């Protein structure tokens, strides 16, 4: 069970150029001016992917990453940068550093991040320890959840697959000159496949995720943002 809450004061950024939220200078800048190797998974790439989870989507880019998963959906998964163990890749969600308190090394687990609530993921590859600490020797990953866009939108997205797999995503969002908001709910269920040979018992997985973001623009230089993300996962697994 994971709850993430953050309140961030950010300068308002121009929207007419590609923006990298994390960078060696910790300042937003265009991709073309970042002096290190960068991969961006934008909204278009996320929507076109057939994967349910962000970690699977990112792992499909084998030219940039090494990804692993210890089993089926819901089992521990991670992203390795520059061939280093995942503990050397620092992960942020909406600018807040993430870690897994249940892990001895604090490695971040990608297994519960469903893609439909994510706006983009930005990856800096190579040593970023001078900026983000020793945990960023391999690089840094910043995950950005969705925010409201001008007007009012309601979205429903449903996908199904084999082994009793279903994915439902609901959201509503909007923005005006001062305010923006996004509220999203996503549910993923699957009967799974047993990790043991000759075993008819399946390893089921359930995931419920809620994202709620609100922003208020005071002026052209100051904006306050509140970000809440709650993810609950339930996994059945075999003891070999």
Short names for language-model regions:
Residues 20, 54-61, 77-80, 89-92, ...:
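N-terminal periplasmic accessory domains that precede
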Residues 38, 46, 58, 121-122, ...:
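Non-catalytic regulatory/gating segments with a bias toward low-complexity or hydrophobic composition
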Residues 68, 108, 130-132, 157-159, ...:
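Outer-membrane beta-barrel domain signature
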Residues 97-125:
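Short acidic/polar hinge/loop motifs at secondary-structure boundaries
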Residues 142, 150-151, 159, 171-240:
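Periplasmic-side early beta-strands and strand-to-turn transitions of outer-membrane beta-barrels
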